[in-house]
């Protein structure tokens, strides 16, 4: 943004406009308000003024440095006596200073400093004075509180001492009294003893005893008084020492407060100093300041840095003041701008490696020549608090990106990985779990990032369409049972012959056509009626506006008719009933109406909302009435869609053409589809390379409710997928790949679940026979219908396993897959190429071709029936009654029998019955008639029989003779 006035320039510099106006006036640029124009010359004058006020010199060179380099060689012997040549390089450096310019610059600097004492400086000083006053008031308040606290403590201490002293005195008095009483008692006892011993002496001795007793009492009193006096003196000395300690502490606190007040009340140094002769050596030129315009003018004395610690005796007197602009490093802290506040601010600065002061206060290499060589700044830097970041970790992230998210070097991440026992490079990709562990290890907080859902763009795009809604043609789906005449009816409407060219006379693909009638355009969807094409009918009902339900007048309501009614009701679509084949003699429209009423489709003449139209696809009777009713329903629905908008639609059918690649039949539902648009259909995307109508003629655009066939997709889309036009091919590819990843994850999860389920079933039920199949069909809908129909044939003993199903011809890859999985290849309306046929013959792979879905289902059903285990059935061939029992040595028991029913064969099994209870089941060991072995004995003849491993035969037993036969099972 160009700064043409004062306000804009202040906004660019991020400073108040009032401060900028004051600086402009100080620089000699007369600007009265913020709206005044500001030229480049004015900015240059302001910059020049601020540079000079900050101590910078003008651009003229007043100093020149000459460097001379001299190289020489010397020869010197080493320890071994070998002479070596050493290169010696001598560098000499000399600086010449123009003294007059230095003095003149100093005078000008002093004058400019005097001019710089403007309102901004006064305001700043007033603000500092106010802050100092607040600080002094706060410190004084703290001092008063501290003194009050000390006085309270002193009073409490005195009270405690007085109480302790009184207690001590009382105890001493009691002790002295006790001691005196004891001494008196002892003296009395002694006196009594003496009196008892000297009773016999003369009377003058009694007076001497009284005198001795009085002397003892006086001595005891003197001793007690002396002890009490010593105790009182000790207590007084102790109290005096404590009082002196308290006085010292109070004096120290008062001295500290007084020192703080004196420091804060000390007047600041005058900005304009007395003119002193300049020093012969020019001070070092400070580093060029960036952002000079952001700082107000300050006196030259503020250029000095805070003093550093120096050895004892090396410090200059505190009252000595350096000349202006001399940059004296020995100046007392607080003498320059900010003082100790600046020092604290520096400690809060960014922590860097090495010297960040430009060498001014560092060693002898940096700073002014020959000054303070042994001085070093030992400024303490407070430790910085570690920064804990919230790192969003995606599913995969490289080492470099992860380090960037944590604002550290990639080498730190690599170190942590090495400690964890994993060697990585900077470009190696890590998974989400590992990356989160590393983030936590480095002290940050890891958050699993949400997946970027590209499909959110589609929702935003849908909400942003505000195109004008215009009327569109209705989409009519023709549904009904197989062979009820749906396609023939459409052929008569379109004047075409589609039904005649279909295999088996049945529709196996969903077709889309649009018809121009005198009252408007109608788009028809022709759906198959076979039970296998349930998904096709569901898609037709989903994409339609009106359903035409075709019912044969001679056949009535059939299972697929009921299914079509259910699809229409689920989609909330109005139904128009066409009672077909009324030209047949056995037609009974009234019975059809009654059956449809039972299914919930009530005709208008019965008070319902579904028009019933009797038609004949053969003669064309009633077709005009049918179209009239369809268009009437469309007018009631008021169908509208945006035309000038990106196209949206649905995939009706899709296939893989050998020359064209993936081909999809699309019904445009809204907007206009143009050739060259970028389309997205499920997991497929691409640019529309070619667009054909239902007659195979090229077209450039397709509006709402128009079916077209497009080419140029990346793969065959799924039938029923939504089609949308996107402005960017990159975004379409991103969404398609995202959907492919989701589909792959779901597919793998389903496969894993299926594997586990099948494993558990096999463990519980034993081995199950599998019939592996590879299915290749011409279009997506037929492939889907065939797969679903074959999977329904699975039983508990034989299961259909679809190894692979796809759209297109049979290739070598399919044959190789069949070889590996021992599968049968089924081609529905497709053929194998020459290489695939040769490979199949070489490997013995069975390839079956079908063009009618009935035939494919029936043959697979027959193959599964052959895989079923045969059923074993018992057939009773005869009954034998035991008449007599013979015991034959070395043979065992032989029963003489009469065949009462049927026939007895030598190879038959036998069941022994006694009183109609089975006691043994086994095989015949021998069958004889008159000592001859025979193969069979018929009813009414006698024979001899022996049963293997059974000798407990008695008269009256019965032998039930039977055979076990195997019967083939069917599904």
Swiss-Prot record:
Enumerate the PROSITE patterns for this protein: G_TR_2, IF2
Show the ranges annotated as biased composition (Pro residues).
Answer: 277-286
Region named G3: 526-529
Kindly provide the name given to this protein in its UniProt entry: Translation initiation factor IF-2
Cystine bridges:
none
- Give residue spans, biased composition: Gly residues: 356-369
Q: Where does GTP bind?
A: 480-487, 526-530, 580-583
- Is the keyword Cytoplasm assigned to this protein? yes
Similarity annotation? Belongs to the TRAFAC class translation factor GTPase superfamily. Classic translation factor GTPase family. IF-2 subfamily.
Residue ranges of the region described as G2: 505-509
The segment annotated G4 runs over: 580-583
Naturally occurring in which organism (per UniProt)? Burkholderia cenocepacia (strain HI2424)
Its main localization is cytoplasm
What range(s) does the tr-type G domain occupy? 471-640
Protein's job: One of the essential components for the initiation of protein synthesis. Protects formylmethionyl-tRNA from spontaneous hydrolysis and promotes its binding to the 30S ribosomal subunits. Also involved in the hydrolysis of GTP during the formation of the 70S ribosomal complex.
Q: What are the subcellular locations of this protein? A: Cytoplasm
Keywords (A to Z) from UniProt: Cytoplasm, GTP-binding, Initiation factor, Nucleotide-binding, Protein biosynthesis
């Amino acid at each position: 943004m160009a700064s043409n006035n004062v306000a804009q320039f202040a906004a660019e510099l991020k400073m108040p406009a009032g401060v900028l106006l004051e600086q402009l006036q100080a620089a000699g640029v007369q600007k009265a308000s913020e709206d005044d124009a500001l030229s480049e010359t004015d900015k240059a004058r302001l910059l020049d003024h601020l540079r000079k006020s900050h101590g910078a010199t003008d651009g003229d060179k007043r100093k020149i440095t000459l460097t001379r380099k001299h190289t020489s060689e010397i020869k010197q012997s080493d320890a071994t006596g070998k002479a070596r040549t050493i290169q010696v390089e001598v560098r000499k450096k000399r600086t010449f200073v123009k003294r007059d310019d230095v003095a003149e610059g100093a005078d000008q600097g002093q004058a400019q400093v005097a001019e710089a004492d403007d309102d901004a400086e006064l305001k700043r000083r007033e603000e500092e004075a106010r802050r100092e006053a607040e600080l002094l008031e706060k410190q004084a308040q703290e001092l008063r509180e501290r003194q009050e606290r000390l006085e309270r403590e002193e009073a409490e201490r005195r009270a405690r001492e007085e109480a302790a002293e009184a207690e001590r005195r009382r105890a001493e008095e009691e002790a002295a009294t006790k001691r005196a009483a004891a001494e008196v008692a002892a003296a009395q006892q002694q006196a009594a003893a003496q009196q008892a011993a000297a009773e016999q002496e003369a009377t003058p001795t009694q007076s001497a005893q009284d005198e001795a007793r009085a002397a003892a009492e006086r001595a005891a009193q003197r001793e007690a008084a002396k002890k009490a006096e010593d105790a009182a003196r000790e207590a007084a000395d102790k109290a005096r020492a404590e009082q002196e300690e308290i006085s010292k502490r109070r004096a120290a606190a008062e001295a500290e407060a007084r020192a703080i007040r004196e420091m804060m009340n000390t007047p600041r140094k005058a900005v304009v100093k007395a003119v002193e002769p300049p020093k012969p050596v020019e001070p070092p030129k400070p580093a060029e300041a960036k952002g000079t315009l952001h700082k107000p003018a300050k006196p030259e004395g503020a250029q000095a840095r805070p003093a550093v610690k120096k050895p004892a005796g090396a410090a200059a007197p505190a009252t000595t003041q350096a000349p202006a602009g001399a940059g004296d490093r020995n100046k007392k802290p607080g003498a320059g701008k900010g003082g100790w506040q600046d020092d604290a601010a520096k400690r809060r600065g960014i922590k860097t490696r090495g010297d960040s002061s430009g060498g001014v206060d560092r060693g002898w290499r940096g700073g002014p020549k020959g000054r303070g060589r042994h001085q070093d700044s030992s400024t303490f830097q407070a430790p910085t608090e570690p920064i804990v970041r919230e790192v969003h970790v995606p599913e995969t992230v490289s080492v470099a990106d992860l380090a960037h998210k944590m604002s550290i070097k990639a080498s730190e991440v690599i170190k942590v990985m090495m400690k964890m026992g994993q060697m990585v490079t900077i470009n190696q990709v890590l998974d989400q779990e590992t990356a989160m562990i590393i983030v936590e290890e480095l002290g940050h907080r890891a958050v699993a990032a949400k997946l970027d859902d590209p499909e959110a763009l589609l929702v935003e795009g849908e909400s942003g369409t505000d195109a004008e809604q215009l009327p569109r043609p209705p989409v009519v789906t023709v549904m009904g049972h197989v062979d009820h005449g749906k396609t023939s009816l459409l052929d008569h409407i379109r004047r075409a012959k589609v039904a005649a060219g279909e295999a088996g006379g049945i529709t196996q693909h969903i077709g889309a056509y649009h018809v121009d009638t005198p009252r408007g355009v109608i788009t028809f969807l022709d759906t198959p009626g076979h039970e296998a094409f349930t998904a096709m009918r569901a898609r037709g009902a989903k994409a339609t506006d009106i359903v035409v339900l075709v019912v044969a007048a001679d056949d009535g309501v059939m299972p697929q008719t009921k299914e079509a009614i259910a699809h229409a009701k689920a989609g909330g679509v109005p139904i128009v009933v066409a009672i077909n084949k009324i030209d047949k003699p056995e037609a009974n429209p009234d019975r059809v109406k009654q059956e449809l009423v039972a299914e919930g489709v009530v005709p208008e003449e019965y008070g319902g909302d579904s028009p019933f139209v009797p038609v004949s696809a053969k003669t064309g009777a009633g077709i005009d009435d049918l179209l009239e009713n369809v268009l009437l329903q469309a007018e009631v629905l008021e169908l509208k869609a945006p035309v000038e908008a990106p196209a949206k639609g649905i995939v009706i059918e899709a296939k893989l053409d050998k020359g064209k690649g993936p081909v999809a039949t699309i019904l445009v539902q809204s907007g206009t589809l143009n050739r060259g648009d970028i389309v997205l259909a499920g997991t497929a995307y691409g640019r529309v390379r070619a667009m054909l109508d239902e007659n195979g003629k090229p077209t450039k655009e397709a509006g709402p409710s128009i079916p077209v066939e497009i080419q140029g997709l990346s793969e065959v889309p799924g039938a029923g997928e939504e089609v949308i036009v996107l402005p960017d091919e990159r975004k379409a590819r991103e969404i398609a790949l995202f959907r492919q990843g989701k589909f792959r994850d779901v597919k793998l999860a389903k496969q894993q679940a299926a594997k586990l389920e099948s494993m558990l079933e096999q463990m519980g039920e034993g081995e199950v026979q599998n019939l592996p199949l590879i299915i290749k069909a011409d279009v997506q809908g037929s492939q889907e219908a065939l797969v679903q129909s074959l999977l329904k044939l699975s039983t508990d003993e034989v299961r259909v396993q679809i190894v692979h199903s796809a759209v297109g011809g049979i290739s070598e890859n399919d044959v190789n897959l069949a070889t590996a999985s021992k599968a049968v290849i089924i081609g529905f309306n497709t053929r194998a190429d020459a290489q695939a046929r040769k490979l199949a013959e070489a490997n013995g792979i069975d390839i079956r071709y079908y063009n009618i879905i009935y035939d494919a289902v029936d043959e697979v059903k027959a193959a599964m029936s052959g895989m079923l285990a045969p059923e074993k059935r018992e057939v009773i061939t005869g009954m034998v009654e035991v008449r007599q029992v013979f015991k034959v040595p070395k043979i065992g028991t032989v029963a003489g029998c009469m065949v009462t029913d049927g026939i007895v064969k030598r190879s038959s099994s036998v069941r022994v019955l006694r009183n109609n209870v089975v006691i043994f089941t086994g095989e015949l060991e021998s069958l004889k008639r008159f000592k001859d072995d025979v193969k069979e004995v018929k009813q009414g003849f006698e024979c001899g029989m022996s049963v293997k491993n059974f000798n407990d035969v008695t008269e009256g037993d019965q032998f039930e003779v039977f055979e076990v036969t195997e019967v083939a099972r069917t599904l």
